[in-house]
Amino acid sequence: LTFDGGTVANATGEILDTLKATGVRATMFLTGQFIHRYPELVRRMVREGHEIGNHTFSHPRLTTFAVNRRQDTLPGVTKEFVQRELRRMSRLFEEVAGTPIGAYWRAPYGEHNREIRQWAAEIGYLHVGWTRDLSAREDLDTRDWVADPHSPIYYRAEEVRERILNFGKGKVAQANGGIVLLHLGTQRRQDRVHRELEAIVDGLRMQGYDLVPVSELHRSLALGQGGKGSAVAAER
């Protein structure tokens, strides 16, 4: 399970309570803005054993995807810009948490390409996305960030739960190696996805899955023990 934290943290306390109650350690991809606004929540994440990944400092757009559905690097997005965003977040995290950040990052809005990933890799970061099965047209993006119930990509909380629990059914790897994308804040006034988190955890465990931080998944993939569809292996 992975959670992105941009600027809103109104679901974070409940999420951390649920993860603690169920004994799950997750990976949190945080921006520098999130760390600046919510230092106590960040320290709690670290104290309770969660892994922190880099989500840049200011959550900028990096590619043209929002304009033309292509992942072309935006004008002005340079190696220096990307590395500065990652380093600023890393420095602030270490100041607040008293420990270095891990080696994983996630691009804002899922906007990245080989060039951008290489720039990040040059300063020690491996990109982590979320699981997509293009052949089946399904993925593990919960869409919990979609607040408008009339949107064609809106899913009710119970629909999100069922999409996760049924992901990969009938396939050899099933959801093994899968990475789920959730968020630490929401604009939904009701039907909040994180309220289904305990049921999601219980359902996945009943199917025999272990829920681990990204670093443990990455190690298992390196040893040949993970699923083929992992977004860690696919986006080096």
Roles of regions detected by a PLM:
Residues L1-T2, A26-L30, E51-N54, I101-A107, ...:
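Structural recognition of the beta-strand scaffold that forms the well-ordered cores
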Residues L16, V42-R43, R117-A120, E198-V201:
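Short amphipathic alpha-helical segments and helix-helix/interface helices
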